[in-house]
Amino acid sequence: MARWIPTKRQKYGVAIYNYNASQDVELSLQIGDTVHILEMYEGWYRGYTLQNKSKKGIFPETYIHLKEATVEDLGQHETVIPGELPLVQELTSTLREWAVIWRKLYVNNKLTLFRQLQQMTYSLIEWRSQILSGTLPKDELAELKKKVTAKIDHGNRMLGLDLVVRDDNGNILDPDETSTIALFKAHEVASKRIEEKIQEEKSILQNLDLRGQSIFSTIHTYGLYVNFKNFVCNIGEDAELFMALYDPDQSTFISENYLIRWGSNGMPKEIEKLNNLQAVFTDLSSMDLIRPRVSLVCQIVRVGHMELKEGKKHTCGLRRPFGVAVMDITDIIHGKVDDEEKQHFIPFQQIAMETYIRQRQLIMSPLITSHVIGENEPLTSVLNKVIAAKEVNHKGQGLWVSLKLLPGDLTQVQKNFSHLVDRSTAIARKMGFPEIILPGDVRNDIYVTLIHGEFDKGKKKTPKNVEVTMSVHDEEGKLLEKAIHPGAGYEGISEYKSVVYYQVKQPCWYETVKVSIAIEEVTRCHIRFTFRHRSSQETRDKSERAFGVAFVKLMNPDGTTLQDGRHDLVVYKGDNKKMEDAKFYLTLPGTKMEMEEKELQASKNLVTFTPSKDSTKDSFQIATLICSTKLTQNVDLLGLLNWRSNSQNIKHNLKKLMEVDGGEIVKFLQDTLDALFNIMMEMSDSETYDFLVFDALVFIISLIGDIKFQHFNPVLETYIYKHFSATLAYVKLSKVLNFYVANADDSSKTELLFAALKALKYLFRFIIQSRVLYLRFYGQSKDGDEFNNSIRQLFLAFNMLMDRPLEEAVKIKGAALKYLPSIINDVKLVFDPVELSVLFCKFIQSIPDNQLVRQKLNCMTKIVESTLFRQSECREVLLPLLTDQLSGQLDDNSNKPDHEASSQLLSNILEVLDRKDVGATAVHIQLIMERLLRRINRTVIGMNRQSPHIGSFVACMIALLQQMDDSHYSHYISTFKTRQDIIDFLMETFIMFKDLIGKNVYAKDWMVMNMTQNRVFLRAINQFAEVLTRFFMDQASFELQLWNNYFHLAVAFLTHESLQLETFSQAKRNKIVKKYGDMRKEIGFRIRDMWYNLGPHKIKFIPSMVGPILEVTLTPEVELRKATIPIFFDMMQCEFNFSGNGNFHMFENELITKLDQEVEGGRGDEQYKVLLEKLLLEHCRKHKYLSSSGEVFALLVSSLLENLLDYRTIIMQDESKENRMSCTVNVLNFYKEKKREDIYIRYLYKLRDLHRDCENYTEAAYTLLLHAELLQWSDKPCVPHLLQKDSYYVYTQQELKEKLYQEIISYFDKGKMWEKAIKLSKELAETYESKVFDYEGLGNLLKKRASFYENIIKAMRPQPEYFAVGYYGQGFPSFLRNKIFIYRGKEYERREDFSLRLLTQFPNAEKMTSTTPPGEDIKSSPKQYMQCFTVKPVMSLPPSYKDKPVPEQILNYYRANEVQQFRYSRPFRKGEKDPDNEFATMWIERTTYTTAYTFPGILKWFEVKQISTEEISPLENAIETMELTNERISNCVQQHAWDRSLSVHPLSMLLSGIVDPAVMGGFSNYEKAFFTEKYLQEHPEDQEKVELLKRLIALQMPLLTEGIRIHGEKLTEQLKPLHERLSSCFRELKEKVEKHYGVITLPPNLTERKQSRTGSIVLPYIMSSTLRRLSITSVTSSVVSTSSNSSDNAPSRPGSDGSILEPLLERRASSGARVEDLSLREENSENRISKFKRKDWSLSKSQVIAEKAPEPDLMSPTRKAQRPKSLQLMDNRLSPFHGSSPPQSTPLSPPPLTPKATRTLSSPSLQTDGIAATPVPPPPPPKSKPYEGSQRNSTELAPPLPVRREAKAPPPPPPKARKSGIPTSEPGSQ
């Protein structure tokens, strides 16, 4: 037999399809699940998913993609570590975590966050794929890593997940390998970085002006990206477009041009540039970004003929001005607009012509045509006019571009925006240097601008069309190829031809080009300008020769470069070839300035070649701007560099160096420094230059400290270590420095000294490097100890300086403290580190106390940051000083201590001591512990939790505690001199720890920091616990408060939110457990041990420690619970033994109180309840004396927990207020039994609030009444627990009770329970009248009571219906299961609405269609079955109302209120069926339900506590029916007699239903069934009942007579036929009845109308028993023959409704002997009339007045038009899910009433003591819980486990079309 083989290589994989397990042995997989594979066998793997390691199973091999992994501890306990990059693993786990949250966001409809997360997730997935591809270069991978980590961190913050701390390379920090301080700083940095990123994104989203924002403060260089889309303009010739940035306020161009050559065909000249015309204008500084206005301008130059329409014979290739296009881009530059996709239209303005027609005659010849005049205006002039104009008439012509501002220099832009900027992108540089000059940026650009000229027209009648040709030549006259660049985007050209203006004497060009030549060529080169007239005729143009030449040299004779600015050039004319001979004309002056100088010298050259008069008339002006990193225009700098050739000017040049522009100096940094040190060394004889060179060096170092030149720091460093070679410079430099410091009191030297101190770091680098070079060449022996002495001397000078009074040289002192530590790392290379440490100690000590405190602390911080402090022997010297200074600071109570600087210093010390490479640290830790631990603690205790420094101090404390080992702890305790000192320290520490645990110093998302704190605290707590046990355990030394604080601290730690693993995601939980374990268990076990160690002291902690221990036991960790729950038994036992009372009441009360608080706060679960009960019972049963009382208590607590858990579940999860009420009452019940009034009252008010929210004012009143009943009408003070938080401010019980009564009366009034309100107001009135004598209050109360009386009679008060609801099946919770409840419906609520409301609470419940009690099969079913039907309340009238004519409005209250019994009747058949008269065998089964409490009460439902059933015989049923009918007729007649305004329709329907045999039939059934000899022979005992029935039939006649009479009086035309029919039928009926059953007359007093005192009619309700008693029978007896002689062919009906059973019998003729069930579906319109007959068959015969609910349908307007046969008067009791219309009642039309017959019940009577006499009611059924529902087939047994078949093949993977799809058919899952 084959077997499973352990895998060797296949250890780790990912599911690539979903797999649904079909057997228990299989493991379900979802796509993406990672699996650890343990074994394999024939195409199957066995293992588990890494998300749930506890469940192992098998799964098909083909569903898994294997991945590389490292296996640790191979074998039974092996673990797999994926072999992917750590970043990929982080990405994977992040995506898994986000995916879960992403789904939740969608479910919770948080769509904005959902979409944000979706985009971030897509980005991460894409980047993960790129990383996994392995194709990225190293630098791109590093860049992508930054993007990935930034995105993860941002997403985590957005989702409220934990902050991930990383090192500089983006790798996650391991807290075990990182110091606490470094960890804290990393959290701060990460938090700040994410916050800045979020703010940056917000700013972009909100389109904020980003100037001044952090993004601009960190970036100094920008670029503007321009993407040229199209140029729409009808030129007809080629064109050149010059785009540049322009400042309209200063009328200057900011950048060089970007050139686009546009063809005459409307496309780029180079077709490859189509859709690829883009440029970046670089080097923009932050100053450029805040210019008030910036424009993007485009100048268009036409290249072709002089005139547009000229033909072939005309000259072509001329550059002619055409127009401009301008766009204001200020918003884009300022960052307000940022959309690289948006295309901007820049309107084109052609040069205007009309404006020049006027001027033509004045300045031009009349021969000129007008169309070219406008073209002579300079483009820059047009440009400014367009900018000034509000709008341009562009006629649809213009440019289309898109723009984007890019932060960073060119290199950064190419890296960060590679999708925009590539190799083909043109780079247009700024005409000037960027804000920050980079050392590697070699640039040699000379910008030349042709400004204007003036040329004599000579022999021509019109001015010339001058074209300037510009070229670059060397001194030999040789042309430099491609040296001129008209614009970026194209290579250089050799000659540049200017724009030609037509016949203009003084043309203005303003054309700028860039001359770019090699630096070494600059000294030899010059620029030549040739002037030529261009003719529009091609033949003439060819013959035109250059008429003039001008030139300018790029270097001045003194070696400086041509100065920036304007230059007036001399235009030389002549026809000889000397004009082209550079050797010749270079001897001439190039500029007017040179000429003036030469004229003074009267040179010989001027004699041989003197310009003619014409040449002096011509002028030409240019402007130059040089942007060169290698050329200087500064004479002084050049003089310094060439100092040897002009040594007499050294002093002058050194002084002038300070005035040279920094940009010039950094260009020649190395040369300048070489010159300085050469001067110092070569001129060593004289000290004259030493100070000047020193000052110059300081100036240069300071210059490089400027932000503009900060990137030259590496250049300076490189110079010092690679090029600097002055071996003796240290002597001179240190001498000068010493002199300056020693003479600090010389005010003339103050600024020089201050500058020197700022440059101290680099000064000393020069000094030390010089000394190193010296030692390398000469060794130590030459100068003895001279150098060391100079260092000592320097420190001595500093010490003297620091010791001077503060007001003197405070600036210098501050600078010394700030900059002196910067020399440490260099000096220690050539100076003894220990001595250096001593020197620094003396330096610090020389500063007077309380002076420059912050500067001093910062100085010490820098000392600690230096490498000096990392040497153990140096620390021996420095640390005592540092701890002294710190302890002085932290102890300083008089002045405000500098917490920021102190924490910085302390954290740096501790961070160094935590390093592995700094030697032994134990002694140093001990020193810090002894001197600073207590001070740190006290600082933390005294510091505000909102202080910005609290986090740093706590980190220092954690770091120190972490670095202390066990011996440190022991030693520290031994340093305390007295026992009290130890107590004080422990007290402080415990209180501080507890405070820090309770109020988190660090943000919740600083998970690593918080867990590090927890781990350190746990160790410290355990260490201090040992101290407690050692010093404070025995009877003499026991410290109660200390132990108490320990326990409370330990519990606070254990219950801290950061340790509650259950609340975290699985991923986070695994992370924490793997790194830190479950710390709760460790501290929990320690708490247990410490408790048991207390011995006889335990009693001192009862009951105070019950709550904390309860918190521990409630922690959802099974082992911890098992370990700590027995402490409860120990407490019980302890109190039982030591209290002297032989009980544990203190413990019991405290546990109940705390349990209530904790469970309500969300703690505890079902498992806890079971475990608590089990463990307590186990321990109690073993105890000799606690076995019985302990067992009772254990069960009691278990019961309480069950109620509280139910309550919490409903409150937290169920939206149904009813279910919340139910659980609240359950808890109330418990606390009432336990006499815990404090908690009881608290829950009363919770219930009150729930009722108030639901507008259940009656129930709210009854709830408050329970509180009022606990109070007395006395002046006893109110104990606190009797008052609630929202209660009134009162002092005595009487005051509180009065306030409560007023509120209760108000609620009763709102709930229309005026009878109850009257009762309470009487009690309150008595108090007002005879106790407190508040007559004013009494008057108001009586007025209110009067209104209640009035409301009872006049106000409409609908009666609620009552419903019985049975919950059957095991699917319901235990407190509902197989129980019946009676519900009080809301106003106008029908049964259909009610049942629907219930079913929404229990969606899984199945409606039962039967009203029969279900069988055992239903009750034991795992499903939920619900039975719902209407029941009728049994009225219980007060004795004072019996046998009295009580008004209907008063009785109505008792019909539906103050009831506790309810009835439901169901017909069934008994005996043999009589085909002629089924009525004789139809019986009624009447069920009476008695509830636990009277309605209304504190709930709208109560459980049925007793059910009794009786059977009503057909004869008794007939009697009841007749009595009810007679009551209805009587009262309907009375109402119509007394109130003529009532509608006659209900009376018509009632009468026709009784007297018209065609509608209802007659009483033939009664006659057939009961009025026969046979019946009386068989039932002689019924003789009296038969007589009674006959009398009731006879009694109906006088009532009908009165009814017919009133009907006739209120007759309308429409009703006449009906009335005639009624009268006819009634005459026949009356004649027959009087003949057989006698004549009965009613006394007149029954129909008298009584006036109330106010004149209103009081309508008495007359019962059928009263009618019988008071009626007079004139025919004493009637004999009814057995032959049913009253049938008269048509059956006659004896009652208002006839028999209830008649319709049933007609429909059920074929049914069996007993009707077992009346289905809900059988009720239809035919049996609705039986409602009249089903109204509560069950009234006691002893009652004179019985309860009957009004029948609303008789008066409802919706029923008026219906035929009598379909009267909607049926009782709901036979139709559980079809209710009647709600009852209605108005003062003007009281509803017709049908009292119940008097009949004795067979059921036992129930007590109805009212709410005060009964316990608090149990809960109503709450909504079912999800887990309590079950499927229909859940009763089936689970199928047996599959047997492994050897040959079973694994299922094939699903088709690969969609990996995410779930396979529809899988062999493996069948």
From Swiss-Prot:
Keyword Secreted in record: no
Highest taxon of source: Eukaryota
Gene3D superfamilies: 1.20.58.740, 1.25.40.410, C2 domain, Dedicator of cytokinesis N-terminal subdomain, SH3 Domains
Ranges annotated as biased composition (Pro residues): 1784-1794, 1815-1824
Record-annotated DOCKER domain positions: 1231-1642
Entry keyword annotation includes Coiled coil: no
Keywords: Acetylation, Cell junction, Cell membrane, Cell projection, Cytoplasm, Guanine-nucleotide releasing factor, Membrane, Phosphoprotein, SH3 domain
GO cellular component: a single term: cytosol
Domain SH3: start-end pairs: 8-69
Record-linked CDD domains: DHR2_DOCK5, SH3_DOCK1_5_A
Any one of the GO BP annotations: myoblast fusion
Localisation per UniProt entry: Cytoplasm; Cell membrane; Cell projection, Podosome
In-chain residues carrying the UniProt-annotated modification Phosphothreonine: T1794, T1814
Residues modified to Phosphoserine: S365, S1756, S1766, S1785, S1789, S1834, S1869
Region feature Disordered, mapped onto this chain: 1679-1702, 1772-1870
C2 DOCK-type domain residues: 443-627
PANTHER family noted in UniProt: DEDICATOR OF CYTOKINESIS, DEDICATOR OF CYTOKINESIS PROTEIN 5
Domain notes: The DOCKER domain may mediate some GEF activity.
Subunit structure: Interacts with CRK and CRKL. Interacts (via N-terminus) with tensin TNS3 (via N-terminus); the interaction increases DOCK5 guanine nucleotide exchange activity towards Rac. Interacts with ELMO1.
Full protein name: Dedicator of cytokinesis protein 5
UniProt lineage: Eukaryota, Metazoa, Chordata, Craniata, Vertebrata
